[in-house]
Design a protein with these regions (language model features):
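Helix-start/capping segments and mature chain N-termini
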Residues: 1-77, 99, 103-285
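Ordered, amphipathic secondary-structure segments that act as subunit-interaction surfaces
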Residues: 80-93, 100
Length: 285
């Protein structure tokens, strides 16, 4: 199994210097991205990621040059060439290359596309099912985190603060309301019902989040309510968990100094994690 990198139409050696110093993605974080799980040698929920990618590009005014079929073929080529069975594909599209200037001329820019496929440490992924610690931090991101850009400085700082405190990640609060994690969405369980922040401009509409809302929870007969909730609700929740592309459903067993669900993964959380893993193994275009 070989990890591969693909840039603007050709495979390149790992570490190759292929990105221009005038690339707006490098200079300004002026680019969008997606991360897709590879499960049993297939992309999981690729069409969902593509839909979100195209939306991000429209919101960023980056021209769409490739069809969904073209992108699907590239993902399949990366998997075939690498022979990776369990991993992820990273895709980034920048606005293009031009001398540094904040404003851009769309007609003079050609989007630049980078893709890479990497192995996943499945032992580490499986261990997440045992539960993680999180810390609470203020949400200092901009007002359009629903657009998946590489402009991630607040996320980076929050994640670094969390890891320095030996936590898996940070749970973010904006004006007292729990929005999401530094790299994930957040769910709370109370009296058998799932709660998560509405999909507005203050959260990223996570693909795993969508799987829980629209497929996994309904298949288990679990009600989901999208509503804002505060720290008091979080502290009173029976269970808490994160969702993201790599880890799936990730039980939270400690928030700051407080144990969650008795310091072990909650029963509903584990049911959701197991059902999601089954869906991923079965596959979804």
């Amino acid at each position: 199994m070989q990890e591969l990198t693909y840039f603007n139409g050709e495979f390149v050696e790992p570490g190759a210097k292929v990105i221009s110093i005038d690339d707006r993605g490098y200079l300004f974080g002026d680019s969008v991205y997606e991360v897709v799980r590879v499960v049993k040698g297939r992309c999981f929920a690729l069409s969902y990621h593509q839909d979100r990618l195209y939306r991000s590009m429209r919101e960023m005014d980056i021209p769409v040059k490739m069809t969904p079929d073209d992108l699907t073929e590239l993902h399949e080529i990366l998997i075939e060439q690498s022979e990776i069975k369990e991993g992820y594909i990273y895709l980034q599209i920048s606005r293009g290359v031009a001398p540094r200037h904040h404003a851009y001329d769309r007609s003079k820019l050609e989007p630049q596309m980078l893709m890479s496929i990497r192995n996943l440490d499945m032992d580490a992924v499986n261990k997440l099912g045992e539960g993680v610690k999180a810390i609470a931090l203020p949400d200092e991101r901009w007002d359009h985190v629903d657009v998946k850009t590489t402009n991630l400085i607040p996320n980076i700082l929050a994640q670094t603060k969390a890891e320095k405190k030996f936590a898996y990640t940070a749970m973010l609060f904006r004006d007292g309301v729990c929005t999401e994690g530094a790299t994930s969405n957040v769910f709370a369980v109370k009296d058998g019902i799932l709660y998560t922040h509405p999909a507005d401009n203050h959260i990223l509409k996570g693909i795993t989040r969508q799987m829980i809302l629209n497929r996994v929870a309904p298949s288990l007969g679990i009600t989901v309510i999208e509503k804002e909730f505060d720290r008091a609700f979080v502290d009173d929740a029976d269970e808490l968990f994160f969702t993201d592309t790599i880890g799936g459903v990730i039980p939270i067993t400690k928030l700051d100094r407080n144990p969650v669900s008795g310091g072990k993964p909650g029963a509903i959380t584990l049911r959701l994690r197991e059902a999601l893993e089954k869906l991923m193994e079965e596959g979804l275009p």
